[in-house]
């Protein structure tokens, strides 16, 4: 190859390797900072308490809930607010007074907003939101979660709380991990580009890559703890039932022996 062409090729290769290393190391760095997810069973009820969930629903019949649209959730959609000034409480206030316009019903709305220390719920998970793709499946069948990005908010703690929330929603709604999607996944008709760079800090070049896979893997590990608790509880219940059955058998045996000796 001519020296100029070879030089350009090497630069492109170095750029690709640099992007891969950066995206891969971002998840690895966050994993080190957060620490590994424990592999011990966790009571789903205790997991719910850890979320520090506050319910502040949009008024029924108003704004994002002015039309009752029932939903059986099949997906979970992860967003980031891209709002440097609004915390979870500010977003709740905006939704509750219909300040965010758009979508099919005329008002934007989603189910949960997460910041470093709390989760606020805006919609029941049995109702459709307006957060992804107008009248597409992202709105019709998915629970929308927004991660805050305001100044002073700990991004890593927010992501971890979001991962725990997603795991809990997977558990209670029987949603498989492959149905946890980035907002990017749902194309928006009429937009260019149709796929939004969201949640932008979990994507590479505007698309899901190694960092997104790291995040989804962390959700899966939190979910596995909840399932493990069910399995451990089921095993313990089976052991207790077996012990009870054996005790009853022994008691019946001694009743027979006692009756026989008494007759003798």
State each model region's role.
Residues 81-82, 125, 138, 143-152, ...:
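Cell-envelope and extracellular/periplasmic
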Residues 4-5, 61, 86, 195, ...:
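Intrinsically disordered, low-complexity segments enriched in proline/serine/threonine
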